[in-house]
Amino acid sequence: MKILITGFEPFGGEVVNPSFEAVKHLPDSIEKAQIVKAAIHTVFRKSIEVLEELIVKEKPDIVICVGQAGGRAEITIERVAINIDDAKNPDNEGNTPKDEVIFEDGENAYFSNLPIKKMVEEIKNCKIPASISNSAGTYVCNHLMYGLLYLINKKYKNMKGGFIHVPYLPQQVLNKKNVPSMSLDNIVQALVCSIKAILKEYNDE
């Protein structure tokens, strides 16, 4: 079993992005599954292109994309991605798409085919707050999640995939009053726990 897990580079003036900080601290294997870690550009279109290059190269069984959700207090497992880009702020190359369809031949929305409720349950069993989210937004996180699920639907039908949002790190909120954060250790542990839940689901099939 091979799992590709990605995190984003920093964006929006931040020096770090907790998603890739956590991803790069993951072990190289979890319960005999190989863990392949990669950074993704916080850029519309390019993010999906890089992800597909990684899929072609690595041929993973499971793909988990991880992103930063500043302002959220817990780990959130995304249920659905929608076929729209609507950026309030520019991406890392200055793109600000407004009400743009991601793929003309794609569905209005695609649902994660990961065991999202079992992932939340396992993270909570690890004493870390978690919940299901029903909106990944309309920025690059939703864009990449939609792109992943589109690719699964169109080309890689045996592959499983989904998206996890993580909170800010403590150092990111030093000058952000009343904004929640989570330690890097807890974010890393939450990712490990979610991967274990996924592996249990598919190893039991």
Curated annotation (Swiss-Prot):
Any one Gene Ontology BP term: proteolysis
Intrachain disulfide bonds: none
Catalytic residues of the enzyme: 78, 141, 165
Annotated localization: Cytoplasm
Domain of life of the organism encoding this protein: Bacteria
GO MF: pyroglutamyl-peptidase activity
Signal peptide start-end: none
Alphabetically ordered keywords of this record: Cytoplasm, Hydrolase, Protease, Thiol protease
SUPFAM superfamilies named in the record: Pyrrolidone carboxyl peptidase (pyroglutamate aminopeptidase)
Statement: the UniProt record of this protein carries the keyword Phosphoprotein: no
Recorded coiled-coil stretches: none
Enzyme Commission number(s) from the entry: 3.4.19.3
Broad class of where this protein is predominantly found: cytoplasm
Cellular component GO terms held in the UniProt record: cytosol
Database matches in Pfam families: Peptidase_C15
Catalytic activity: Release of an N-terminal pyroglutamyl group from a polypeptide, the second amino acid generally not being Pro
Assigned protein family: Belongs to the peptidase C15 family.
Described function: Removes 5-oxoproline from various penultimate amino acid residues except L-proline.
Assembly and binders: Homotetramer.
Protein name as it appears in the record: Pyrrolidone-carboxylate peptidase
Organism annotation: Thermosipho africanus (strain TCF52B)
